Amino acid sequence: MTTTVIIIIFVAIFATTLHDARGATMEPCLESMKTASLPDLPYAYDALEPAISEEIMRLHHQKHHQTYVTQYNKALNSLRSAMADGDHSSVVKLQSLIKFNGGGHVNHAIFWKNLAPVHEGGGKPPHDPLASAIDAHFGSLEGLIQKMNAEGAAVQGSGWVWFGLDRELKRLVVETTANQDPLVTKGSHLVPLIGIDVWEHAYYPQYKNARAEYLKNIWTVINWKYAADVFEKHTRDLDIN
């Protein structure tokens, strides 16, 4: 589902720049796209306490993520109609909705997998080869965490801080994106390993305006096993150490 959403985001973003000769391929592409659905969480809403409260998890998943899914599906259906009708003005207007809500769905689907209760390994440091790669590029795991926290705290307004793999440069990177932009909007060669939501809805009910405290505590429930699995999958043909 995540790959499907990313594809449709880029179809929408670049729709007006495509040559007319390619227009004939866009409608079948849109028709093949499936609507998004809210994924179930792999843990209970209170399983991440005290790092993240049950109240926040319920609101974040049931309200915020669900809204992105609903609005994305609505925009996707409208885009299909606009393309079928040749309504280029509406196609242009729908691009920002597709990007924002589709991106919100993509990011949150990753975010839930990036978290795990302590009793299920949340916060447990990663194993090799990811551990060695982190040491090589950031000096230590603590060095990576400090950089992530600093970059996340410095995001102006709303956005995300990412720990990712740059397959082109063959190295690990820390990046930030604004609003609900997925990491892939900075380049298809970037693979998200960990994404941390720094929108206020992710922490304000519990931490108020103390974003730095939220960033400090969230590492106790980070699912490093998931990050390590994604890293290994995408580095089988790379040497990044």
UniProtKB/Swiss-Prot annotation:
GO terms for cellular component: mitochondrial matrix. Coiled coil: none annotated. Binds 1 Mn(2+) ion per subunit. GO terms for biological process: floral organ abscission. Pfam families: Sod_Fe_C, Sod_Fe_N. Transmembrane segments: none annotated. Its cofactor is Mn(2+). Mn(2+) binds at residues 60, 108, 197, 201. GO terms for molecular function: metal ion binding; superoxide dismutase activity. It is found in: Mitochondrion matrix. It is an enzyme of class 1 (oxidoreductase). The keyword ATP-binding does not apply. Keywords: Manganese, Metal-binding, Mitochondrion, Oxidoreductase, Transit peptide. The keyword NADP does not apply. SUPFAM superfamilies: Fe,Mn superoxide dismutase (SOD), C-terminal domain, Fe,Mn superoxide dismutase (SOD), N-terminal domain. It catalyses: 2 superoxide + 2 H(+) = H2O2 + O2. Its EC number is 1.15.1.1. Homotetramer. Destroys superoxide anion radicals which are normally produced within the cells and which are toxic to biological systems. Belongs to the iron/manganese superoxide dismutase family. This is Superoxide dismutase [Mn] 2, mitochondrial. The lineage of its organism: Eukaryota, Viridiplantae, Streptophyta, Embryophyta, Tracheophyta.
